[in-house]
Regions:
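Short, charge-rich amphipathic segments
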Residues: 1, 20-22
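Short, small-residue-biased leader/transition segments that mark boundaries at the very start
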Residues: 2-7
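Reductase modules of NAD(P)H-dependent flavoproteins
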Residues: 23-143
Length: 143
């Protein structure tokens, strides 16, 4: 899609300038194999595993308080399990950092007609993730 192309280009530009820190996590070393897909020009790549078999032992959100306190973070872009996104988005909000979340929903039709992918708006109503998203300002959706 055009949106994903724009995102990829922006990520490549930021990473090339050494301005992007990426935090990834998984249950174990086998689940973070995709760490090698990120550009080597990142400012920082932080890897966490629940069992400590690779990187820092713990959940990915466990490194955010220190990262937010010690680094100049302009924006957080989060995807993953709902509870992790909710926790990370709240940490970003508490630190005064703009945050976007990528909502994962089953999408039946891709046009918003079937309503299989709806998520609640923070101020009431619903978003159709397939039509309105899938990326949203974290303050505008209920996580």
């Amino acid at each position: 899609s055009a949106a994903s192309d724009v995102y990829k280009r922006q990520m490549a530009r930021c990473a090339k300038r050494g301005q992007m820190t990426v935090v990834i996590g998984g249950r174990n070393k086998e689940e973070v194999f995709w760490k090698d897909l990120f550009p080597k020009t990142l400012k920082q790549l932080i890897v966490t595993t629940d069992d400590g078999s690779y990187g820092i032992k713990g959940f990915s959100v466990s490194v955010l308080p220190e990262l937010f306190a010690e680094e100049q973070v302009d924006e957080a872009c989060i995807c993953g399990p709902g509870i992790m996104m909710k926790t990370a988005a709240q940490m970003a909000a508490d630190a005064g950092i703009y945050c976007e979340v990528s909502m994962e929903r089953r999408m039946g039709c891709g046009t918003g007609t079937c309503l299989a992918c709806v998520c609640d708006k923070a101020d009431g109503g619903h978003y159709k993730v397939c039509f309105d998203g899938p990326v949203f300002n974290a303050q505008e959706v209920c996580l």
